[in-house]
């Protein structure tokens, strides 16, 4: 039964397609961040949110891997000792299949790629803040009649310090979530406005060049604001914008950015789908798993529809066997598992501890190797015992009782004044040798012959070692 459910579960888990992020621009937008500082703050929060979710997924997969190793060690150890492992073990183990690792690796790579874009945009928004500046006036003095010999005094640039970065906009006071990521991010275009302003007497009257006080003032500005419009004339009372243009910092397209945000959101959702093996909902809520419970635990046909009383029975079986909370699952599965003894390699020797004391990947990996080796040895020893004694042992002979029931290769012996049916090892050996001779003879007659001999041990080890390497 355990093998059957394990096989069905593995088929189900491997049939699940890998979850990948897709790209499609959102239709709803957040409130626009109107300044570079606000946009940089928004991207910073978005970056930290993504990093936190990636770290959670990596940690979850890492812990799942350790739990899977423990489950496999416990399963092999129980099997080697003649016991049975519950169907929960098989399912939880299968849930740590390569498909889950593929989901993590693929979507983590997508997220890291998108984070590179976010970090680059954030840096450029801050860069715009650092180049936002206004020059002090460059002046041209009057020389009495005209300006051709008037003196020019050069001004300098002063970086504009903003205080808006000390606070957040209402849109960005809350932490981002999946709803936030399902929208366009409302990011301001990365442009830098350049303006050249001209004034006569700095708005103090007409300029006749009659005296050195009749100055023409020229000012340069760079910032992220609207570039404004140029004036057709220079009014003596106002500063006129003589030149204005936008400098495009990068050639980003808003639809491309929005599509990237969608891919980012989908990749994060895919990471969230990695199950937490300490939560019973990771498997009891799975429709395919419930179908398996109905088939294997309740002996229902695989085509049984899970409705009504059948579904109620399945839900009760899930609750009884696996619990409905992490604490119940711990009591029913993890605590007994952690109490099991496991042998592992350490400092060139084999040590034995409870599974709960094995915390490193090296300890768990070597413990799995030891468990596999022991399981193979037990199987081979059992096979040799069967071949040697013709499938009979002292225990099976004793169970037959005395008298006519005690037949070769068993025989009656007297121990402590009582008759017992015990295995006659010489007779058992003769029976086994005769069986081998008969098998060889059948082979010469064209019938099936077992030619593996001692090689069967190596043949049996191959799939086990492959399973060990693929874990």
UniProtKB/Swiss-Prot annotation:
Protein name: Variant surface glycoprotein ILTAT 1.1BC
Location relative to the cell: Cell membrane
Glycosylation sites: 130, 220, 260, 450
Disulfide topology: 397-410, 406-421
Species: Trypanosoma brucei brucei
Membrane topology listed for this record: Lipid-anchor; GPI-anchor
Chain positions covered by the region annotation Disordered: 158-183, 204-232, 432-454
Comp. bias regions, Polar residues: 158-168
InterPro entries (UniProt xref): VSG_C_dom_sf
Superkingdom of origin: Eukaryota
Signal peptide start and end residues: 1-21
Residues that make up the propeptide removed upon maturation: 455-471
Basic and acidic residues bias: start-end ranges: 214-226
Alphabetized UniProt keyword annotations: Cell membrane, Disulfide bond, Glycoprotein, GPI-anchor, Lipoprotein, Membrane, Signal, Trypanosomiasis
UniProt function note: VSG forms a coat on the surface of the parasite. The trypanosome evades the immune response of the host by expressing a series of antigenically distinct VSGs from an estimated 1000 VSG genes.
